[in-house]
């Protein structure tokens, strides 16, 4: 893990852990999604719009928007680049709060809220259609395990990284 990645995880992890106490969304899931969706905070969406999660700005969204390109997989095989309008925020904290609010307000994400097993949470968010990538759940699980993100889920969590020998010095 690079120092930059470590700092990203620590920054988003603090926000996600605090948010988990209010929302019931596992911090490890939130961090993994932020890593995957924002490219470690380097995507144009994140740099210009503080958007960590690539949430599209639907017709009900009244906040700021950012136009950007994204990859969508409509047939389960082929990825297509499309341009869309995405939600933009004043800060990463606002992005994390809106992410959990989106999950909490939409019935399709009901299985994610309060789930304590990170693998089940990853499967649930993918099954609910958060992303079009058919390998989305597996990618999230791999990120959580590679970077031992369940440490942010708090004591007493049923979630345990399968590679419990993962250390901060591990590179990937």
Question: What are the roles of these predicted feature ranges?
Answer:
Residues 1-172:
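Catalytic cores of secreted/periplasmic lytic hydrolases that degrade extracellular macromolecules
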